[in-house]
Every structure is written in C-alpha cells, then in structure tokens.
C-alpha cells in the first residue's frame, strides 16, 4: 500500500471450491465431486479465506471476494455436478463459458490454471524443497518426525515448516485442524505435496 493508491482488491478465492481444482479432474464420480466441493466450502475459514484476510489486511488493504457471494454459492452448488466434472478438456469450463463474448480477452478466459504456489515463482518453490533436503539427513528426518503424533510431517520440507511452527508456537499444533491436501483417496492424487504442480495433469499450467 506504500506504492499504490489502490485500497480494494478483487480476489478469486472460492472459485476452486465451487468449480473444481486441478485434482478434482480425477473425481471418480459426480457425487464424489459434489461431496468434495461441499467439504472444501465448509473448511474455507481455515484455509483460503483466512489466508486472503490475513495477507491482505496486514497490508492495510481490503478484499472483495465475488465468488463468495452467498446467492452465487447456493446457485453453483445447485447445478448438477455432472456438468461441473472436467469432461470438456478445460477446468472450470462453466465459469469460463459464462464469461465468453465481450467480458474477457480470449487469452485470459481460456488460459491454463496455475497453482497458487506458482505466484512466488517456480524457483522459490523448488529452492525451498532443495534447502529442506540439506537440513536433515534421512535418519534425522525419521527421528524428528517421530516426535510428532499430531499432524506428523511427511516430507523434509513439511518437517522444516513444522519445526518453525513449534519454535514460535510451541505446543499449539492442536489449533491446526487439518493439513490441506488433495483427496489422496482418489486416483492419481496420492501425493506428498499440496501444490497442483505435482499432479500428472498439471501440464503446461503456469507457463
């Protein structure tokens, strides 16, 4: 806010929960897609909405979340989930289709979705993973992970973050209800990283 007069930002939170993430391309059925969507919406206050509120407010800015409009959410959740499955070869097809015409340039309307982590740059994401590999040996990783019975880390990177958390918020891990991950019970979603970058269908996204 020190470098702009802009005080209000439009953000895209909740579009993933309503219309699908990259990983929901692998939903085994329309019913499974709908159940997952409902779960993600119930948990918004712990993840996306919380992140947006904190990261924007700390910079003395305000956010507007148009996809969070209650009437819009109810409308989209009432759509037959069969129509929301990615059978079109492009994620969030219904949302994109609704903005065809004079609303958005084609290059924006139909571009590939990029993972949230890509906003910090591919190199930083990869550098953090590589750095974590230098911090712990395999033996240290196994030993230190064993210290945690709740939300146990499962990669060296996640252990690094957990130990930073414990350093500043010792003994308060119980406030973390869940660790955001794709539905690992679904085909091709049993991954060790929450980023869509690790999914087989990520393709050219973010380029």
Residue map of PLM features:
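Adenosyl-5′-phosphate
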Residues: 4-11, 23, 29-207
């Amino acid at each position: 806010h020190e470098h702009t007069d802009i005080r209000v930002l439009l953000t895209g939170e909740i579009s993933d929960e309503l219309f699908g993430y990259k990983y929901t391309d692998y939903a085994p059925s329309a019913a499974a897609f709908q159940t997952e969507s409902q779960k993600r919406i119930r948990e918004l206050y712990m993840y996306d909405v919380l992140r947006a509120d904190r990261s924007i407010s700390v910079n003395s800015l305000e956010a507007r979340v148009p996809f969070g409009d209650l009437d819009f959410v109810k409308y989209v959740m009432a759509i037959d989930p069969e129509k929301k499955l990615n059978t079109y070869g492009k994620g969030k097809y219904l949302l994109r289709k609704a903005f065809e015409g004079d609303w958005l340039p084609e290059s924006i309307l139909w571009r590939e979705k990029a993972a949230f982590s890509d906003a910090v740059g591919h190199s930083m994401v990869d550098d953090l993973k590589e750095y974590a590999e230098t911090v712990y040996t395999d033996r240290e990783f196994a030993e230190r992970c064993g210290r945690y019975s709740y939300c146990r880390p499962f990669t060296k990177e996640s252990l690094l973050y957990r130990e930073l958390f414990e350093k500043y918020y010792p003994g308060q891990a119980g406030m973390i209800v869940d660790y955001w991950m794709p539905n690992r019970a679904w085909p091709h979603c049993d991954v060790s990283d929450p980023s869509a970058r690790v999914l087989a269908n990520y393709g050219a996204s973010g380029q």
